[in-house]
Amino acid sequence: MGLSLAAYAGAALAEIAGCFAVWAWWRLGASALWLVPGALSLGAFAWLLALTPVEVAGRSYAVYGGIYVAASLLWLWAVEGVRPDRWDMGGAALVLAGAAVILWAPRG
């Protein structure tokens, strides 16, 4: 469980940072040099997601989706300085609950 959570959290941070690098270049006028660490970060995202101990890729991606939503709201608050509202938090709780069902459902 610990490795899985660390891999998902690391993947979320890497994907959000990589996408933000492109956003900064495209939308904020940052130097094109931002694309280099952005591409490296997106590569790290794919590698970390592949480390998750889920037996099939699609299920791993579905679980990751819930973690990505929660991590995106943390990024919104910590990096962009916008505090998530109750609707953001409620939506995140719903998707995390769905991710938990997908991850821990008994399969047989």
From Swiss-Prot:
| Domain of life (superkingdom) | Bacteria
What are the subcellular locations of this protein? Cell inner membrane
Q: What is the topology of this protein in the membrane according to its UniProt annotation? A: Multi-pass membrane protein
Q: Where primarily located?
A: membrane
Q: Which UniProt keywords apply?
A: Cell inner membrane, Cell membrane, Membrane, Transmembrane, Transmembrane helix
| One cellular-component annotation, GO | plasma membrane
Transmembrane regions listed in the UniProt entry:
5-25, 32-52, 62-82, 86-106
Entry similarity comment: Belongs to the UPF0060 family.
List, alphabetically, the HAMAP family matched: UPF0060
Query: Any idea what this protein is called?
Result: UPF0060 membrane protein RSKD131_0092
